[in-house]
């Protein structure tokens, strides 16, 4: 004859619980590995600066510097010429 259910029920339940625990541990390990990989990708991404943004910032600074130079030249020229008075009126 065979074994009775009452004899093998505890053994079967223990085996299922062990398999369930192993599956949870495996899944937890996979999630931790994925999180570690994603964290390393974020770290690598944060190290590099965006080249396009750097170029735009450099252009903006260059434009601001050029404008300051133009303004300085304009004020120097105005000071050199002196304050302009009224011009001679032409008689008609």
Curated annotation (Swiss-Prot):
Residues 17-80 form a coiled coil. It is found in: Nucleus; Cytoplasm. This is Protein LSO2. One of its GO terms (biological process) is ribosome hibernation. Residues 1-92 are annotated as: Disordered. Keywords: Coiled coil, Cytoplasm, Nucleus. Associates with translationally inactive ribosomes in the nonrotated state. LSO2 bridges the decoding sites of the small with the GTPase activating center (GAC) of the large subunit. This position allows accommodation of the DOM34-dependent ribosome recycling system, which splits LSO2-containing ribosomes. GO terms for molecular function: ribosome binding; translation repressor activity. Induction: Constitutively expressed. Expression is not regulated by iron unlike the LSO1 paralog. Residues 1-10, 38-72 have a biased composition (Basic and acidic residues). Disruption phenotype: Mild slow-growth phenotype in response to reduced iron levels. Displays global translation defects during recovery from stationary phase with translation of most genes reduced more than 4-fold. Ribosomes accumulated at start codons, were depleted from stop codons, and showed codon-specific changes in occupancy. GO terms for cellular component: cytoplasm; nucleus. Belongs to the CCDC124 family. Ribosome-binding protein involved in ribosome hibernation by associating with translationally inactive ribosomes. Required for translational recovery after starvation from stationary phase. May facilitate rapid translation reactivation by stabilizing the recycling-competent state of inactive ribosomes.
